[in-house]
């Protein structure tokens, strides 16, 4: 956590990385696209050098649950502006329950703080908890407004859980681009939008994610750290956004999005693992 804060002092200008470094990553992505009949988008940003590389990085993909990082960052921002109290409580009603609410479904009739709702949705991807946050913020449009405020002109949130995960081809609602969300994470974790305390809390939630052990975490190089948030949706949507770093490697922000495939969730997970392994190899070989 301290290491990440060191890099929050300066965000360098972005420059396109030498594509030869990522030749294997691109090759792997193309092979996976063909084998799964999928659409894949990738973006990678080195926060120290400002170098970035992308594959279909400006094309749109369903946000799915990767929006939860942004919603909770908005909660932190509003709290810092004195516009919301993260310790305020919301009574949980049975009507609040939606598909996949492992934390909230056990607390019907009880109260939960907004802070705890963010912890629940960030660490378990609890959908009812996400809706509690969205309602407190003023709805999905408030998240989109926040994104525009911090310079993201592409990412948009239009619906709540679980409808936002529809993933229909050509539907602009609830979408992002790999490049846009990498830039947004860079601003939220290393920029000036949030205080250092806010950045640390957002990172803490991402580091303690409990539902991504079979994705990038499974191929993380020894001695590296990761803070991430994943998502899944209709029409084969699968995604992950992550920050990875080590003592020798400055933070790297990665986004991987899959869409429009009939592949199983296991095969989509495996695709993310293979792409992640190739990305990590680029940086681990540099630091040897």
Curated annotation (Swiss-Prot):
Enzyme Commission number, as recorded: 3.5.2.6
SUPFAM superfamilies noted in UniProt: beta-lactamase/transpeptidase-like (SSF56601)
Disulfide bond annotation, renumbered to this chain: 72-118
PROSITE patterns tied to this protein: BETA_LACTAMASE_A
Alphabetical keyword list: Antibiotic resistance, Disulfide bond, Hydrolase, Plasmid, Signal, Transposable element
Binding site for substrate: 229-231
PANTHER family per UniProt: BETA-LACTAMASE (PTHR35333), BETA-LACTAMASE-TYPE TRANSPEPTIDASE FOLD CONTAINING PROTEIN (PTHR35333:SF3)
Protein task: Hydrolyzes carbenicillin. Methicillin and oxacillin are weakly hydrolyzed.
Misc: The class A beta-lactamase family has a specific amino-acid numbering system, sometimes called Ambler or ABL numbering and often misspelt as Amber. A multiple sequence alignment was used to derive a consensus sequence and then the consensus was numbered taking into account insertions and deletions. This allows use of identical numbers, e.g. for active site residues, despite differences in protein length. UniProt always uses natural numbering of residues, hence there appear to be differences in numbering between this entry and some papers.
Name of this chain's protein: Beta-lactamase CARB-4
């Amino acid at each position: 956590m301290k290491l990440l804060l060191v890099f929050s002092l300066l965000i360098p200008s972005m420059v396109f990385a030498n594509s030869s470094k990522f030749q294997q990553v691109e090759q792997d992505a193309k092979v996976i696209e063909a084998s799964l009949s999928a659409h894949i988008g990738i973006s990678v940003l080195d926060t120290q050098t400002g170098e970035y590389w992308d594959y279909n990085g400006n094309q749109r993909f369903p946000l799915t649950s990767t929006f939860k990082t942004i919603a909770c960052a908005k909660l932190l921002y509003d709290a810092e502006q004195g516009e919301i109290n993260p310790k305020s409580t919301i009574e949980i009603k049975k009507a609040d329950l939606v598909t996949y609410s492992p934390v909230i479904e056990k607390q019907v009739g009880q109260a939960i703080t907004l802070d705890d709702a963010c912890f629940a949705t960030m660490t378990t991807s609890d959908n009812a908890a996400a809706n509690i946050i969205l309602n407190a913020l003023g709805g999905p449009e408030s998240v989109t407004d926040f994104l525009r405020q911090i310079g993201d002109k592409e990412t948009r949130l239009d619906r709540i859980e679980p409808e936002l995960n529809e993933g229909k081809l050509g539907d602009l609602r609830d979408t992002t681009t790999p490049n846009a969300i990498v830039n947004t994470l860079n601003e939220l974790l290393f920029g000036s939008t949030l205080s250092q305390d806010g950045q640390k809390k957002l990172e803490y939630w991402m580091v303690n994610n409990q539902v991504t052990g079979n994705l990038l975490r499974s191929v993380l190089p020894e001695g590296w750290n990761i803070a991430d948030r994943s998502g899944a949706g209709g029409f084969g949507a699968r995604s992950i956004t992550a920050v990875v770093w080590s003592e020798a490697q400055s933070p790297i922000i990665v986004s991987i999005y899959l869409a429009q495939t009939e592949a199983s969730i296991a095969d989509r997970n495996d695709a993310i693992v293979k792409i992640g392994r190739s990305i990590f190899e680029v940086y681990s070989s540099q630091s040897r």
